[in-house]
């Protein structure tokens, strides 16, 4: 009331409701995409799904009409690949999910994993943020839904959340039929902190393989792209007893690559 008097404006709850309902449409569409991504015939994997979710979907919240236009095109591609039983990623040896803060200075990391080792990254942690359906019945239910949606934000739910935020990846890996989890030990955000030991203990009881890879999120000088590749190479050789699909990609000089 006092804010309204001072500003001379009244909050438009009808406009809020309209935007929240569009947000719900985006959420339902996102969840439908996951059903296709869980199959062997997904046309969505590697870097693109996470990038789209993080930089377009997450910043829309029902306000950007271009989101659903793009999503409808994506859905057609997913449906066509599934109906025709097309294997869009024929070099796949392992299906993986990534969790934790990724190296923002190497967004093509999933593409390298696939081309070098046949590791198909189906989904990443960022994909599971901001997907709460909001009850638009009244003002209180909308505010409650908005708050719960904020709770699932990347820096809240996945890294410093107040519940079983980090270990949810075991369940997500199972939903997407993944046999490998790549846990980003992001030193900028202090990684998994004290949960690292818990995660390693849990991994001993799981059939899903766990690979921990360090990065420094925004600073390639601390943990370079070559350092990240070497961590993966060492794991694949020693733990998985695997050979690369393309040995020429094991290491190369991209230190100055901006």
Predicted regions and their residues:
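Short, small-residue-biased leader/transition segments that mark boundaries at the very start
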Residues: 1-4
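Long, well-ordered, tryptophan-enriched scaffold segments
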Residues: 12-38
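Aromatic-residue-lined binding/catalytic grooves and analogous aromatic/hydrophobic interfacial grooves
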Residues: 37-115, 137
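Active-site proximal loops enriched in glycine and acidic residues that flank catalytic Cys/His/Asp
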Residues: 100, 123-126, 182-187, 214-217
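Redox- and metal-dependent alpha/beta enzyme cores, enriched for Fe-S-associated oxidoreductases
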Residues: 100-161, 165-170
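Flexible loop/turn segments at secondary-structure boundaries
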Residues: 103-107, 129-134, 167, 188-193, ...
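C-terminal hydrophobic structural anchor segments
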Residues: 163-207, 211
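C-terminal regions of proteins
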Residues: 200, 204, 210-256
């Amino acid at each position: 009331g006092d804010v309204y008097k001072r500003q001379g404006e009244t909050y438009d709850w009808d406009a809020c409701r309209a935007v929240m309902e569009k947000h719900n449409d985006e959420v339902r569409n996102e969840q439908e995409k996951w059903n296709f991504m869980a199959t062997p015939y997904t046309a969505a994997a590697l870097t693109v799904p996470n990038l789209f979710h993080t930089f377009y979907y997450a910043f829309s919240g029902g306000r950007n009409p271009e989101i659903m236009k793009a999503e409808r095109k994506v859905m057609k591609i997913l449906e066509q690949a599934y109906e025709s039983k097309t294997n869009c990623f024929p070099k796949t040896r392992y299906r993986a999910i990534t969790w934790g803060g990724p190296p923002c200075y190497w967004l093509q990391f999933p593409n390298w994993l696939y081309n070098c080792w046949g590791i198909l990254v189906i989904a990443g942690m960022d994909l599971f943020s901001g997907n709460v359906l909001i009850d638009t019945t009244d003002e209180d239910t909308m505010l409650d839904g908005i708050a719960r949606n904020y709770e699932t934000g990347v820096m809240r739910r996945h890294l410093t959340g107040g519940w079983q935020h980090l270990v949810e990846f075991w369940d997500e890996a199972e939903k997407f039929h993944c046999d490998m989890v790549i846990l980003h030990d992001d030193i900028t955000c202090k990684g998994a902190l004290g949960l690292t030991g818990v995660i390693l203990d849990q991994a001993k009881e799981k059939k899903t393989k766990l690979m921990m890879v360090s990065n420094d999120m925004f600073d390639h000088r601390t943990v370079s792209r070559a350092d990240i590749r070497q961590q993966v190479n060492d794991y694949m050789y020693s733990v998985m007893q695997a050979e690369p699909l393309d040995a020429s990609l094991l290491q190369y000089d991209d230190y100055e690559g901006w």
